[in-house]
């Protein structure tokens, strides 16, 4: 009888689902950077006259500041090349950028701005010292308040790409440029989000090294 009981226990253990890697999604190598419950590894940048930062309804709320509010990632060190970061963002108040991502290009910082300069400009700041409003990435994406948008940035040796929903809005060769950020968002390095006189919500923040991505995704 004892042999039977032990056999049943071993069989049950064998058919249990394997544990998921800590902090990682079950699919495609993505790792969650926000649990939807607390700021966790995200901290307020404490800009002068910045707005309130808190967690509400599963999102990080980056309140409207005078002029800016921001958060910065203070968790375990992440790769600075051959990676992608994705998030969802919504502007609930204001008409300027609401979830601008500062991210590293190897050792240099850069910012992906969506709906900056009064809502009219989307692009990377800065390339060869030029802002998103005056460089090769300058474009316009119409943003509506109270609507969620999916955003993503990917960096490799040969490309920097960025998407808003399914539209690729940035594609450049990083070897052709030097990268920097405006001094106002320096506190968002290496990874951080900022808003300008606007309130933004950010959720579903995910990161993956392209080394962990399935082959079908590495060229997307």
Task: Give residue spans per PLM region.
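Positively charged n-region of N-terminal signal peptides that target proteins for export
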Residues: 1-4
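Carbohydrate-interacting regions of secretory-pathway proteins
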Residues: 15-220
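Hydrophobic h-region of N-terminal signal peptides that target proteins for export
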Residues: 6-17
């Amino acid at each position: 009888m004892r042999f039977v009981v032990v056999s049943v226990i071993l069989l049950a253990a064998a058919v249990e689902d394997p544990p998921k890697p800590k902090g990682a999604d079950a699919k495609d190598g993505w790792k969650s950077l926000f649990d939807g419950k607390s700021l966790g590894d995200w901290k307020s940048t404490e800009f002068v006259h910045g707005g309130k930062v808190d967690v509400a309804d599963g999102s990080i709320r980056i309140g409207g500041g005078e002029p800016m509010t921001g958060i910065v990632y203070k968790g375990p060190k992440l790769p600075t090349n051959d990676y992608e970061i994705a998030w969802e963002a919504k502007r609930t108040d204001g008409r300027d950028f609401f979830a601008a991502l500062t991210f590293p290009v190897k050792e240099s910082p850069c910012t992906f701005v969506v709906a900056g300069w009064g809502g009219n400009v989307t692009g990377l700041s800065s390339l060869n010292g030029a802002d998103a409003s005056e460089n090769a990435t300058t474009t316009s994406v119409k943003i509506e308040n109270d609507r969620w948008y999916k955003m993503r940035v990917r960096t490799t040796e040969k490309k920097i790409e960025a998407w808003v929903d399914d539209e690729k809005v940035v594609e450049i060769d990083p070897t052709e440029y030097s990268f920097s950020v405006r001094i106002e968002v320096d506190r968002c390095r290496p990874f951080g989000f900022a808003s300008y006189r606007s309130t933004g919500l950010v959720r579903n923040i995910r990161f993956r090294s392209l080394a962990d991505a399935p082959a079908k995704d590495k060229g997307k």
